[in-house]
C-alpha cells in the first residue's frame, strides 16, 4: 500500500533523476545533419559550382574554412554557415599542379610559421596534390607551385605540418599502389629523410599504403588503406601513431569498423556520449566511428535520426572548431564528394534534440523504477 507520502517521495526522486540526465546523454547516438554548401542546386542552403569533390579542409583559429576541391583544382572559402568568402573578388582560388581531376588538391594545412616561403612570404595555406606536387597560397587569386617537379611516382592524398627538433616539416601521405610511404619536406619545400626506418610499422599489413596523415596532440596519426591500382579502396584499414621524427609509437586501431579511414577529429566534451573520443571518417563506406582516444577501442558509429549509421558517398575531412565567424563549436563539420565525385557537399552534424514525448517516456520509466524499488523495500 502506497501512502501519499510514498508517492510524493517517488515522484521527487523520478524528477531529480530525469532532470539530471541530459538529452545529449540519452540520445547522443543520433545526429541531425545540416547541408551548408553544395554544387548541386537545392541540396544545401548555398550553392557553389566550384565545390567539386572536396577532400581536405584547413583553417586558422579565426579564418573561414578553406576547401581543397580535388576535382575542380580550386580552394573555396566559407564561414560556419556556408556563406562564400571571396578573396579580392575571386569566388575561388586556383590550385596549380596540373589539370583538374587527376591532379587537384587533396590534403591541406594552415601554416602559422614563418617558414615555407614562396615569393618572399610564408604560404598561409599549403596543399598536397594528387600528382605528387605541393602548392602554397600567399595571396591573390592563385596558389603557387611550391615543388615544380612532382615527387617521382607519388600520389599525395594527405598532408600534415609538424615540428621536430626545433624545425618544421611537411608530411605527405603517398598512397601509390603497393609502394606508398610518407614523404617529408623541410620548410624550404625540399625533400628530406628522417632516417632509415622512419614511418615504418614493424607489423605493417601487405597491400596497405598511407592514405592520410594528421597531427593530433603532438603526434602523427597515419591512416592506412588497401587500395587498388585505380585508387579505389577495399574494405579494411588501420591507424598507426608516430612521433614527428618518424619513429613508430603503436598501432592505434585495426580492422573492425575501419574501412579505408581518412578523416580524424577529436570530439569536444559537448558532443554527447562521444565527447572526448577520437572520430575517424571512413572513405570506404562513409561511416563516422568513435574510438577511445587512449586505448583505440571501438565505441560506436554516429547514427542519423532514423537510428541507422550515417553513411556518405565519398567522405573525406571531418573537423571541429573553437572559433571563427558563424562557427558552431558543438558541430562536426564534414565534406563529401557526391555524384561519383562530380559534385560536393559541405555540412555539419549536431547532437539531435529529443522530442518532448521521448523525454516523457524516460520520466515514466524512471518513475516505474522508483515504484519497483519502493515495493522491494516495503516487501
Show where each model-derived region lies:
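N-terminal secretory signal peptides that target proteins for export/translocation
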Residues: 1-9, 378-379
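Sec-dependent signal peptide recognition
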Residues: 6-16, 358-361
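Bacterial N-terminal signal peptides
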Residues: 13-23, 368
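Sequence/structural signature of beta-propeller domains
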Residues: 28-352
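Membrane-interfacial segments
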Residues: 213, 376-377
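A short, hydrophobic C-terminal helix/tail in secreted or cell-surface proteins
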Residues: 355-373
Amino acid at each position: 500500500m502506497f501512502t501519499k507520502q510514498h508517492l510524493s517521495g517517488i515522484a521527487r526522486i523520478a524528477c531529480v533523476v530525469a532532470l539530471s540526465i541530459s538529452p545529449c546523454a540519452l540520445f547522443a547516438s543520433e545526429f541531425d545533419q545540416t547541408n551548408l554548401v553544395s554544387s548541386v542546386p537545392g541540396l544545401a542552403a548555398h550553392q557553389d559550382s566550384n565545390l567539386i569533390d572536396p577532400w581536405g579542409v584547413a583553417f586558422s583559429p579565426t579564418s573561414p574554412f578553406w576547401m581543397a576541391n580535388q576535382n575542380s583544382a580550386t580552394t573555396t572559402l566559407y564561414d560556419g554557415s556556408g556563406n562564400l568568402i571571396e578573396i579580392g573578388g575571386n569566388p575561388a582560388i586556383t590550385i596549380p599542379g596540373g589539370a583538374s581531376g587527376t591532379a587537384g588538391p587533396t590534403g591541406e594545412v594552415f601554416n602559422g610559421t614563418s617558414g615555407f616561403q614562396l615569393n618572399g612570404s610564408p604560404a598561409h595555406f599549403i596543399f598536397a596534390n594528387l600528382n605528387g606536387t605541393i602548392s602554397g597560397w600567399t595571396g591573390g587569386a592563385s596558389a603557387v607551385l611550391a615543388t615544380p617537379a612532382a615527387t617521382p611516382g607519388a600520389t599525395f592524398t594527405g598532408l600534415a605540418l609538424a615540428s621536430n627538433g626545433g624545425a618544421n616539416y611537411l608530411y605527405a601521405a603517398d598512397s601509390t599502389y603497393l609502394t606508398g610511404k610518407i614523404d617529408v619536406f623541410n620548410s624550404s619545400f625540399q625533400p628530406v629523410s628522417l632516417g632509415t626506418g622512419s614511418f615504418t610499422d614493424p607489423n605493417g599489413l601487405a597491400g596497405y599504403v598511407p592514405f592520410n596523415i594528421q597531427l593530433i596532440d603532438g603526434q602523427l596519426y597515419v591512416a592506412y588503406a588497401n587500395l587498388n591500382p585505380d585508387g579505389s579502396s577495399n574494405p579494411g584499414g588501420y591507424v598507426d601513431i608516430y612521433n614527428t621524427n618518424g619513429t613508430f609509437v603503436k598501432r592505434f586501431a585495426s580492422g573492425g569498423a575501419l574501412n579505408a579511414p581518412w578523416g580524424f577529429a577529436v570530439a569536444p566534451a559537448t558532443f554527447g556520449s562521444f565527447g572526448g573520443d577520437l572520430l575517424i571518417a571512413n572513405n570506404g563506406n562513409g561511416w563516422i566511428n568513435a574510438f577511445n582516444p587512449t586505448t583505440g577501442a571501438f565505441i560506436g558509429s554516429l547514427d542519423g535520426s532514423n537510428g541507422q549509421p550515417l553513411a556518405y558517398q565519398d567522405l573525406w575531412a571531418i573537423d571541429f572548431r573553437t572559433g571563427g565567424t558563424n562557427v558552431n563549436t558543438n558541430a562536426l563539420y564534414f565534406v563529401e564528394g557526391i555524384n561519383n565525385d562530380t559534385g560536393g557537399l559541405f555540412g555539419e552534424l549536431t547532437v539531435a534534440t529529443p522530442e518532448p514525448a521521448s523525454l516523457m517516456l524516460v520520466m515514466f520509466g524512471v518513475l516505474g523504477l522508483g515504484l519497483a524499488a519502493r515495493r522491494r523495500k516495503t516487501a
